[in-house]
Amino acid sequence: TIDTMEIHIDHYKVASPKGRVILFHGVGGNGRMLSALALPLMRNGFEVICPDLPLYGYTRCSKNVTWQTWVSVGTEIVNHYQSTKQLPTFLFGLSAGGMLAYQTATECPQLNGLMASCILDQRNKEVTKHSAKNPYVGMAAKPALALLQRVAGRVRIPMKWIGNMKAIVNNEELAAVLMKDKKSSGARVSLAFIHTMLNPVIKTEPEDFKSCPFLLVHPAEDHWTDLKFSLLFYQRLACEKHTVILEGAGHFPIEEPGLMQQACAAFLESHL
């Protein structure tokens, strides 16, 4: 329980873990959807933590959730598990979880490494324009939400009305199934959450981030968030950084034959 929220966590345990990996989903997922990465990492000897972030999965919350709530929850989770047992700890973020992992890392300087499938700085208008459902929604979203959230911040709408959710996977049938799932891509989120996600308060700019190495594992066929938009932020990072391109993979990389898992495992082993 964090600040009255009952956070559901899928916990992959091993007898003598060599390290700990905390996986963050994005605005179209939940903890279970990260099992394709969690299970191989567990088999490689890592303890893996997959939370359902507020508004998604089985997590229960009655409070008004903002993007900062996610950052606070991520930080609390890192601190909680570090307080129970000190282990080399890494964060991984899928989709919007990439920026969440980065912002959490700025609050938790003791981390060994940071991994993300993309890292989008929504303060950049071009990023918002091209990650929205369509460019027109992207251009209108920020000014409209700035007004609406003041009077109707708690009102919830389907995230798929704003985000280009149909591009979460490069498989139309699977995308349709996911968008019907109220615990993942079909979730309803508050206007306040969307507004704060598009206007994040980033504590440490990338030029000043030096606390741990960063691995960008970006799908080559991502039809939602093109690599060039992640590079706008990634190339500014002052820390040690590495890039792996997942050939043939979509935004949620269901196609690639273990390339993400292999890249992450190699990164983890080299930074224990």
PLM-predicted stretches and their roles:
Residues A38-R60:
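Conserved alpha/beta-hydrolase
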Residues T1-V14:
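N-terminal cap/lid segment of alpha/beta-hydrolase-fold proteins
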Residues L100-G186:
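Alpha/beta-hydrolase-fold enzymes
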